[in-house]
Amino acid sequence: MHPVISQGVLALAAWSEWVPLIGAEVPRLPGVYLARRGQSGPIVYVGMSGERQGEGLRGRMRRYTSGKALASGLGEAVFDRALADLDWVRERLAEVESGQPMRATGWGKAALTWADLHVCWAITADGEAARVLEEQVLSLESVDWWNRAR
């Protein structure tokens, strides 16, 4: 059941169930993923992954959950919003002031935890099909995407 996905997007592909991004068991295949805030929050991001040296969607999600994607795609979108949250920044500052600063990847992981993202995905034949599906989703949905304009 996908109460937050429009019928138009549902008709484009076979979407998985929603699961928390952190700890998600994602396939090693190309495809498109949707991210939303919380268990039933609004969809905020659509992304895609090609083959990624045989890692596909799983490789993309692992990059985000490792904290190593602070400057690309969903990782950057989450980090930008966490940095705009004064309470989140104060927590990081308190860590620094107490002599326990985190590395950049730690900040990335903390931002991802703060965002409480849940994801679902659709498998595609290859990276090009994923790119096309991602564009279709972006054109159908009129939401306040976290995606940067392309």
Predicted regions and their residues:
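GIY-YIG nuclease catalytic motif and its immediate N-terminal context
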Residues: 1-99, 118-144, 148-150
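Low-complexity intrinsically disordered segments
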Residues: 101-105
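Short, conserved catalytic or adaptor-binding loops enriched in Gly and charged residues
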Residues: 107-116
